[in-house]
């Protein structure tokens, strides 16, 4: 929650 769904943010 707090962030829209989608692919993870790369490091």
UniProtKB/Swiss-Prot annotation:
Biological process (GO) annotations held by this record are: regulation of blood pressure
Which compartments does it reside in?
Secreted
The protein's GO terms of the molecular function aspect are:
peptidase inhibitor activity; toxin activity
Which key words tag this protein in UniProt?
Hypotensive agent, Metalloenzyme inhibitor, Metalloprotease inhibitor, Protease inhibitor, Pyrrolidone carboxylic acid, Secreted, Toxin
Task: Give a yes or no for keyword Nucleotidyltransferase in this entry.
Answer: no
- Entry-annotated residues carrying Pyrrolidone carboxylic acid: 1
Q: Does the keyword Signal apply?
A: no
Domain of life of the organism encoding this protein? Eukaryota
UniProt note on tissues of expression? Expressed by the venom gland.
Provide a GO CC annotation, any one.
extracellular region
Q: What does this protein do?
A: This peptide both inhibits the activity of the angiotensin-converting enzyme (ACE) and enhances the action of bradykinin by inhibiting the peptidases that inactivate it. It acts as an indirect hypotensive agent.
Q: Which family does it belong to?
A: Belongs to the bradykinin-potentiating peptide family.
UniProt name for this protein: Bradykinin-potentiating peptide 1
